[in-house]
Amino acid sequence: MKCKKCDQKAVINLQHHNISFCKEHFLEWMRVQTERVIQKFHMFTKEERLLVAVSGGKDSLSLWDILWQLGYQADGLYLDLGINDFNNYSSDSAEFTRRFAEERGLQLTSMDIKAQYGESIPEMAARTKRGHTKPCSQCGLVKRYLLNKLALDGRYDAIVTAHNLDDEAAFLFANVTHWSLDYLGRQYPLLPATTGFARKAKPFCQIYERESAAYAILSGINYIYTECPYSDGSKQLRNKRYLNMMEDEQPGFKTQFYLGYLRALKAGAFPQQQESAAKLEEKRCAKCGQPTQSDGLCTFCRLVNK
Ligand code: Q46
Ligand code: ZN
Ligand code: ZN
């Protein structure tokens, strides 16, 4: 197997594109693909300031590295969730992220949630009805809220997350199987800024998980291999397995599934998007001033105030 570009021995074969690359040309291909997606969806420019959500894992560190190599002004934000019960997931991922930023001279903001709000994510979740077994919904809520708040406070032009094609396709699969029209109206790789919400972009939305892992390994990025202990047995992982079976049978399936959805969304298949955004802007949290659907406090303030 030879590299498509230089005839050297290939180190990776991209079945869905039917091409193979050597290390150097694969790393270059990843940067070109990412830049293409940024341009295609008019995500952001080199003059704008970006806040990248980093977890210490392969996707976020690969994306941060690529944005840096492409010349974007990308700072990192690491949220320490305080998940250290079964393994040292949070402490270790904080260390991988810190070292990555230090080696490249990149600006990293870290927030320790327990130090800031008095409780770790599992402790906060344990006080809620459903969160005592799995803290994922509270974790998602806190991460979304703080990422947005810190981006607005820091006057960043956009939030960048490393959701890859496997993540997006699995989320889409869940939304389609439940016909969650509200979510289906919002799963665009670029969400423009609205009152109280920063712009959000997903430049890896067309990059397979396998490709971002290969990028991290081949470019020598040290990332955390262990997953969060709470991700075990999640619906998202189960849906990824189903989609992997489809992809094995039919290389390129995930790309077709996701790009087909984006075409339908653009054609106006899910008009709920505007309606729910308008509803949200009517009310404000009494404590933090963020738009909220409920009266009084927003869901974040209710969770941390208990
Ligand atoms: S970090 Fe948080 Fe995930 Fe862990 S507790 Fe669940 S949501 S699984 S991306
Ligand atoms: Zn080559
Ligand atoms: Zn609030």
Specify the residue positions occupied by each region the protein language model found.
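ATP-dependent adenylation/nucleotidyltransferase module used to activate substrates
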Residues: 2-185, 194-197, 209-219, 285, ...
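Flexible helical/loop "lid" subdomain adjacent to adenine-nucleotide binding pockets
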Residues: 39, 166-170, 174-204, 209-212, ...
